[in-house]
Amino acid sequence: VMAGLCVLITAGPTREPIDPVRYITNRSSGKMGYEVARAAARGGASVTLVSGPVCLPKPDGVVVVEIETADEMYRAVMDRVQGHDIYIGAAAVADYSVVETSERKMKKSDVAPQLLLTLTRDILANVAGLEQSPFTVGFAAETDDLEANAKQKLAAKKLDMIVANQVGGEEGGF
């Protein structure tokens, strides 16, 4: 079904360091991206998976590129996306990173540290915005207004397709 196609997929969370010990992340397991990669490889596609830190076995027949931060994922994707037929952005990439990370572990004190955050680069929008962009699939993890938010993301980022997931509550997760 997918023989001859080149597919680039992202999966898992990213981690944005605060200091050498602590980081900001999310609850993404990476399972969706890994299963999509497995299915594409079984279908005959040439698959590259750019993965954040997960506890999952590597899919057979898939080239896995391991990254940690949103910036590392951005660079890994943009360095590889040229020549791919399909891009599937299943990763839960951090929206923010810490402006100034501490080189040493921050000690607990009576005064809580204040973290200044900055927006990370939007991998999905950048891929979809390429002059010769691959067929681009995005994911929308939403706690409310699932359909409206997914449609807005589809249009705003000029995606070819979006997969909407209800998260939060007892049954919603990723």
What are the language-model segments listed below?
Residues 68-140, 144-171:
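Glycine-rich phosphate-binding loop
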Residues 1-7, 11-26, 31, 91-92, ...:
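Glycine-rich phosphate/diphosphate-binding loops and the adjacent beta-loop-alpha structural elements
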Residues 2-5, 43-46, 60, 83-84, ...:
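Short coil/turn connectors at secondary-structure junctions
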Residues 3-69:
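Glycine-rich phosphate/diphosphate-binding loop of Rossmann-like nucleotide-binding domains
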Residues 1-4, 168-174:
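Glycine-rich phosphate/pyrophosphate-binding loop and the adjoining helix
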